[in-house]
Regions:
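A glycine-centered beta->alpha junction motif in the catalytic cores
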Residues: 23, 51-71, 104-108, 161-162, ...
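All-alpha amphipathic helical-bundle segments outside canonical DNA-binding/catalytic cores
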Residues: 219-229
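Conserved HxN/HPN-centered segment at the entrance to the catalytic loop
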Residues: 37-53
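ATP-binding glycine-rich loop module of kinase domains
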Residues: 1-36, 53, 57, 65-66
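Active-site activation/catalytic loop segments of kinase-like enzymes and analogous catalytic loops
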Residues: 164-217, 230-247
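Active-site acidic catalytic loop and adjacent metal/ATP-binding pocket
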Residues: 123-169
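Protein kinase-like catalytic core scaffold
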Residues: 16, 42, 54, 134, ...
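Conserved kinase catalytic-core helix
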Residues: 38-43, 59-138, 143, 227-234
Length: 264
């Protein structure tokens, strides 16, 4: 649970964990408030929220390398469908806010002219009014999966509450799953997989981007999910610039390029 790039620190108790960060402009406490307001089996139970963080139930962490990623992906979607996506969107979206946010990131980090042109072309190709709008978790990656002791129920930790720039649109969550399918956890943390013993029904336990595509309602939502995946990866660059080796930053730029190949 001490993974991540936010700078948060953790204090462990017998049945709970305290998460705190004094340098994130209140992001951690807002996360705790969101969890408390949206309590369900899909997310951690929050016991208290304070100025710089919150205290939540203690959960079991199973190493990424031992997870059957196909089974976990299906479990993430099931929990989101039942407890998160089934709720109404709460944050009004501003396309201009999204455009401005992406422009700021492109101004700070050089990802190449081809990626910038792809972003513009893909944004224009999407029918944004046709996309499913609902409450979103904001960060349902494989890395944010834990399990409830005693029941082994899948729990998705560390939500990122929606904003006008990163809104309550289901494609935002699908884009995060695609980020994992591209290998985010392997690139960021150097994780490897031991999937041979975990293979089921003769198929690999590892996921690829097209497993995520099966959860999109149509090509339009898939296009939006790929776009949001690229935006999510761009959003990691400021954090990685502070706490990750240059190779990790270069590899994430490579992931951005890979993601742009999923659409014609």
């Amino acid at each position: 649970m001490t993974r991540g790039s936010s700078g948060a620190t953790f204090r462990y108790y017998l049945e709970s964990v305290g998460k705190m960060c004094r340098t994130d402009d209140g992001r951690t406490s807002r996360q705790g408030l969101w969890l408390r307001q949206h309590q369900s089996p899909a997310v951690p139970k929050v016991l208290s929220v304070y100025e710089h963080g919150y205290q939540m139930e203690r959960l079991d962490d199973i190493s990424y390398m031992w997870l059957n990623h196909r089974v976990v992906l299906a479990g993430i979607v099931e929990q989101l469908e039942q407890h998160v996506w089934s709720q109404s969107a709460e944050v009004e979206w501003s396309q201009q806010a999204t455009v401005d946010k992406v422009a700021d990131l492109l101004g700070m980090f050089d990802v190449g002219v081809e990626v910038q042109l792809w972003l513009e072309k893909t944004h224009e190709s999407i029918d944004w009014n046709a996309l499913p709008r609902c409450l979103t978790h904001g960060d349902p990656t494989l890395d944010n999966v834990m399990f409830r002791p005693g029941t082994s129920e899948l729990v998705i930790i560390d939500p990122v509450p929606a904003t006008s720039a990163v809104p309550d649109i289901r494609a935002v969550d699908l884009g995060k799953m695609l980020q994992s399918a591209l290998g985010w956890e392997r690139v960021r943390y150097g994780y490897r997989e031991v999937t041979g013993a975990l293979d089921t029904l003769g198929g690999s336990a590892r996921i690829n981007p097209y497993h995520v595509q099966t959860y999109a309602q149509d090509d339009n939502e898939w296009n939006a999910a790929v776009l949001w995946c690229v935006i999510h990866l761009l959003r990691t660059l400021p954090y990685l610039a502070r706490c990750a080796a240059p190779k990790v930053q270069d590899d994430v730029r490579g992931m951005i390029g890979d993601a742009t190949t999923f659409l014609p």
